[in-house]
Amino acid sequence: MQARELIQKFITKVSTFPETTYTAEDEQYLFNVVLDLVGEGDETPVVAQETTTLIDLKEALVQLAVDHQRIQDLAAERDILGAKLMDLVTPLPSAVNKRFWTLYEKDPEKALAYFYELSQANDYIKVAAIAKNIAYDVPTKYGDLEITINLSKPEKDPKQIALAKTMKQTGYPKCQLCLENEGYAGRLDFPARRNHRIVRFDLEQQTWGFQYSPYAYFNEHSIFLDGKHEPMVIDQTTFKNLLQIVKQFPGYFAGSNADLPIVGGSILTHEHYQGGRHDFPMAKAPISTPLQFAGYDDIQAGIVEWPMSVMRLTGSDAKRIETLAADILTKWQHYSDPEVQVLAQEADGTPHHTITPIARMRGDQYEIDLVLRDNQTSPEHPDGIYHPHADVQHIKKENIGLIEVMGLAILPPRLKSEMAEVEKYLCDQPNEMAAYHKTWADQIKADHSAITPANVTTLVQNEVGKVFMRVLEDAGVFKRDAKGQAAFIKFTERVNNA
């Protein structure tokens, strides 16, 4: 088809998009806006196969802009232009917020469905890219763990990296979680957010934002962000906020990354939580040891049967749960037990202890899981005593954040090709297996006598799952053996004592 025909097809889709208010009188204007974005060029026929959906047409127009030398063939410039094109079907922030809260008054579930569907339809949530991820479950003694190899985020082009280094740093937006991102065009070193929308809501009389994650790791992966650019802090307000969010956003869990390096998430500079509609393995795990806290007979409590050190609190009164959780946090921040290598802080006062909290509703009951974290390092474990140890870092060496804590592994893209080479090695075929996988692969060979091309993929997937289980055990402060659990009980007794 001709370039102008492609533009017209896109405009037809735009003008009939359910959330737009365009009329026939707007079509010429829209045509010229798109023509300006992609460049006029000549009328050389455009190669555009299967361009039937709005997003397919957008991709074809981005390629047209590259062909017309309107933009460079760089992932960032493609994303920037793509977001500008999809902004044409995205209502203004005020309209999105009005629609969301009008629906919410009648049915909160319909409001969530509206915003989620819009965020997919306007290509803010990268549905096609997310579909590239590899995902499978692996049975373990803690239940099924969820394994994902993250292929959705494009690798950074070396040329793009080099160009980004030459750009002037503006300091705007302050970070990728600021409200300033809404509608921001993007740069080579900062993601395009022209088609990004944020729903505002009140949390403890403060303005917060609710959005979806563009590269979701699970169903309806959400981010709840503070309207102010302030550092992450885990305190009583955190527990109060999480419990309010799960009440306000039905069907969603809400959790926070820890607020210390090594055990925290990748962004510690902006207060935010994550949530979504997903039942994680940890949420399914039962209580292994019931607990009772003095003065809290109305709250069910216990140690969760999980590789990390988790205390679960359940009850009908959010304020009571919040208060007990805050007491546990305070005690943990000052608790040391040298017998099991637990140290609250250094001599200079540098803190080591915090909590990764996750809240959810169980019917009319509030539930919060408190995952104890310790970010000590040692000569033996320079990356962290309670961090993936060296012998499992060939699979996972990054921080164990909120999502991994709950039993969903987010593994790096390199593992797709690397595991294929491991499979060849296990089948005694010519291979280019990375040397750092050899010890692990040899152990797999020793443990399994009948490895064939027919079963090797499932076998390797299961072994990756076992490594992830070990990763979580490494991150657990009180180990699951008798000594570790006795030490855990000892800490819970401290909570009961002033």
Swiss-Prot record:
The keyword Nucleotidyltransferase applies. Keywords: Carbohydrate metabolism, Cytoplasm, Galactose metabolism, Nucleotidyltransferase, Transferase. One of its GO terms (molecular function) is UDP-glucose:hexose-1-phosphate uridylyltransferase activity. InterPro entries: GalP_uridyl_Trfase_II, GalP_uridyl_Trfase_II_CS, GalP_Utransf_C, GalP_Utransf_N. Its EC number is 2.7.7.12. It is found in: Cytoplasm. HAMAP family: GalP_UDP_trans (MF_00571). PANTHER family: DUF4922 DOMAIN-CONTAINING PROTEIN, GALACTOSE-1-PHOSPHATE URIDYLYLTRANSFERASE. This is Galactose-1-phosphate uridylyltransferase. It comes from Latilactobacillus sakei subsp. sakei (strain 23K). The lineage of its organism: Bacteria, Bacillati, Bacillota, Bacilli, Lactobacillales.
